[in-house]
């Protein structure tokens, strides 16, 4: 499980991206890079990390499900993810 502070930091970044999205778009279209540079760094979408919603793990996350590979496998084998079953051919 990831540290709670790391998860909280990522959530803060998500909020900032949402808050400044319109302003960033407007400044990019205008080409005003000086004003864009003065915005908070964490308001850039590239600083947000996809994390597992259950464990907070930052690597091996399936974006479609929002789960890391470990939790995805565990829940899929338990039959808790609808429409997902183990491959067999």
Swiss-Prot record:
Keywords on record: Ribonucleoprotein, Ribosomal protein, RNA-binding, rRNA-binding
Family matches, as PROSITE patterns: RIBOSOMAL_S14 (PS00527)
GO cellular component, one term: small ribosomal subunit
Gene3D superfamilies: 30s Ribosomal Protein S14, Chain N
A Pfam family this chain is assigned to: Ribosomal_S14
GO terms for MF: rRNA binding; structural constituent of ribosome
GO biological process: translation
Keyword field contains Protein transport: no
Keyword ATP-binding: no
Cysteines joined through disulfide linkages: none
Functional note: Binds 16S rRNA, required for the assembly of 30S particles and may also be responsible for determining the conformation of the 16S rRNA at the A site.
NCBIfam families on file: PRK08881.1
Name of the protein this chain belongs to: Small ribosomal subunit protein uS14
Gene that this polypeptide is encoded by: rpsN
